[in-house]
Structure formats: C-alpha cells, structure tokens
Swiss-Prot record:
Disulfide bonds: none annotated. This is Polyubiquitin. It comes from the Eukaryota. Residues 1-76, 77-152, 153-228, 229-304, 305-380 form the Ubiquitin-like domain. There is a cross-link at K48 (Glycyl lysine isopeptide (Lys-Gly) (interchain with G-Cter in ubiquitin)). The gene is PU1. The keyword Cytoplasm applies. InterPro entries: Ubiquitin-like_dom (IPR000626), Ubiquitin-like_domsf (IPR029071), Ubiquitin_CS (IPR019954), Ubiquitin_dom (IPR019956), Ubiquitin_ubiquitin-like (IPR050158). The lineage of its organism: Eukaryota, Viridiplantae, Streptophyta, Embryophyta, Tracheophyta.
C-alpha cells in the first residue's frame, strides 16, 4: 500500500509499504529516498512517536495514512538526575529522547531497572512514551528520581455487580496504571472506568499514595456508559443550554461544561433538579437525571450575607447565607449549628411558612432579616 511521510519543511514523501513492515523498515525506505540516517528520524502518527520494532499494523496505519517526520538534532544536551540520596547523575540526551530512553540511560549508569524508576520534573511524574521536549525539559534541567518500592501490595476493586477483583499494585502506581491492570484482568477499557475511594472519584494522573490508598483498601468501580446523553440547563434569564453528558458525570463535570459554554465559574453556579440543589461530588445517576432532563442554573451572588434565626426559647442564631440558598440549605446550616434535624424545623418569615425548594431571594429575605424557627413535634401532621 502507499503511505505518506510529511516533513517539517512541508515536503511530502510517498512510500510503498506493507502493514507488516516495521518502523525500522520504513526509516530505511526514507533513508533510501532522502538520505536521512534512521537514527536521526522520529516518526509520529496520531500524536504518538513510533517505536522501531513495532509494525505499521500495530499502530493501525492504513493505506494513505500520513506520518510526520521530525529530525533528531545531533549534539544533544546535558541534563541532571537527582536521587533521593542526594546523588546527582549527569546524562547526555536529546530533546527528542523519550522518557523510556532516559530511564534506559539511567539503568546503564546506575543499574536501576526502568520499571523501578519514577522521574519527576516540575512536580509532574513523566510518562514513558513522551519526549523531553513534550515536558519542555531543556539543557541543564534537573529531574528527580524516585524509586518504586518492590513488593507492592494488594488492593481490591469492587464492581457494581458485587464482584471483587484483587490487584497487585504499588503506592507509586498512578490511577491510569490501575485502570490498565483492571483492563488486563476484566477487559474493560480505561475510558469506561471510574474509580471511587472514600467517596471521591480518582483522577488518572494521581498516585495511590496521593489518595492514601493502602494495602487491602477497597476501591469501587463504576462503568461510564458509552454514548452519553443530552440534558438541558435553563438559566434564570430563560436561556436554555444543551449539554452532552454521561450518567456517570459528576456535578463538578457538568459545571465545568457550563463554564466552557457560558464562561460562568463553577463556584458561582448552583444547579437545581426536582427542587434539590445538586452537590459537586455526586453523579447525574445519583440524582436519577436522565436524557433530556432539565436542570435549573442559579447564580451564586458573591459575598453572601448574614441573617438571624430566632427560636421559641428566645435564642437567636446567626447564619452566613447567600440569596440563592434554598430553604433546605438554611435548615442544613441550622442543623450544623444546633443539631435539629431539618424535618423537625419549620421556618417562618413575614407570617409565611417557607418551602424547602424555594430560595431566600424568592421570599425577598435580605441581609439581617430575622426568620422564626418553630419545631415540628414528632408524630404530628
């Protein structure tokens, strides 16, 4: 078949290849045509640097695909690698070297196997397939080398079907790594996995240690449903925004999507569904929000205000609130202060009993207004 190779100068080379050709073979063909030695060639496809021993088929490169050719600059540069013991190693590298290559050089110098090496630069753990240039690592930059402890530990992953999977991991494993291990065992693609621990959704780039996940901890695996769905968000101005979401999206995710569309910072957004204010860490599925559901968006006014709540005993409680707070929210704040369950609270303002789903603004309750708290007797009606 024919494929194309585009150089940084904009020139396009046409090559006759077979799916079974290795990247080495392709580089040799480029050398025949253009005279560029293979060791100065880097080939990129779909944003990935191609490895010499792999075949075109491995990368799903098909007829008339276009590869990009980047030249490795000769001459390279020096970088430093500092270990936890304080020792500094000097390496000769090129910007186009991958993190794998750098780990191999460290192994040559120090004898530490690459799979026990974690490299950190500017507070970020470096991923094997990326290059030094990708991370803007320049001459005389210093990387930090942290060793992965051997031996690791076992953790458990519980699925919604109740099945428990046992994994061999290390504290330094990233959530990506854990998802890859789950894929190896269960065949579930990482992009369909959501991992939850202590009520928090775990982010791919972080490590188990970051979340204080220790041996024999149990994570919960929730599947992201493919395909997603549309929901609507209605603002107080009457405008309706359409969002593409999945049931497994958290309310945080939804607020981020609204920010992308409308530019409203998440901390100024309050989302209401079925009269309830939605909490950031929960998912759409938690609230039974289904396709074509409509959420209501209320803006939080900056700064908030104080109001007073007077009880029948004559005690006055001061609360920090915002106009956009619902009566539910106010009852929750009273519970936090006084320990009275919301279902035993009745709030009265201007002679009116206040309804849970409404906001302070709905009742024209302003700063330093006084509400009256009456307790509902148990068993009553």
């Amino acid at each position: 078949m024919q494929i194309f190779v585009k150089t940084l100068t904009g020139k396009t080379i046409t090559l006759e290849v077979e799916s079974s050709d290795t990247i080495d073979n392709v580089k040799a063909k480029i050398q025949d045509k253009e005279g560029i030695p293979p060791d100065q060639q880097r080939l990129i496809f779909a944003g990935k640097q191609l490895e010499d021993g792999r075949t075109l088929a491995d990368y799903n490169i098909q007829k008339e695909s276009t590869l990009h050719l980047v030249l490795r600059l000769r001459g390279g540069m020096q970088i430093f690698v500092k270990t936890l013991t304080g020792k500094t190693i000097t390496l000769e590298v090129e910007s186009s070297d991958t993190i794998d290559n750098v780990k191999a050089k460290i192994q040559d110098k120090e004898g530490i196997p690459p799979d026990q090496q974690r490299l950190i630069f500017a507070g970020k753990q470096l991923e094997d397939g990326r290059t030094l240039a990708d991370y803007n690592i320049q001459k005389e930059s210093t990387l930090h080398l942290v060793l992965r402890l051997r031996g690791g530990m076992q953790i458990f992953v519980k699925t919604l079907t109740g099945k428990t999977i046992t994994l061999e991991v290390e504290s330094s494993d990233t959530i990506d790594n854990v998802k890859a291990k789950i894929q190896d065992k269960e065949g579930i693609p990482p992009d369909q996995q959501r991992l939850i621990f202590a009520g928090k959704q775990l982010e791919d780039g972080r490590t188990l240690a970051d979340y204080n996940i220790q041996k024999e901890s149990t994570l919960h695996l929730v599947l992201r449903l493919r395909g997603g769905m549309q929901i609507f968000v209605k603002t107080l101005t009457g405008k309706t925004i359409t969002l593409e979401v999945e049931s497994s999206d958290t309310i945080d995710n939804v607020k981020a999507k609204i920010q992308d569309k409308e530019g409203i910072p998440p901390d100024q957004q309050r989302l209401i569904f079925a009269g309830k204010q939605l909490e950031d860490g929960r998912t759409l599925a938690d609230y039974n929000i289904q396709k074509e559901s409509t959420l209501h968006l209320v803006l939080r006014l900056r700064g908030g205000m104080q109001i007073f709540v007077k009880t029948l005993t004559g005690k006055t409680i001061t609360l920090e609130v915002e106009s956009s707070d619902t009566i539910d929210n106010v009852k929750a704040k009273i519970q936090d202060k006084e320990g009275i369950p919301p279902d035993q609270q009745r709030l009265i303002f201007a002679g009116k009993q206040l309804e849970d789903g409404r906001t302070l603004a709905d009742y024209n309750i302003q700063k330093e207004s006084t509400l009256h708290l009456v307790l509902r007797l148990r068993g009553g009606f």
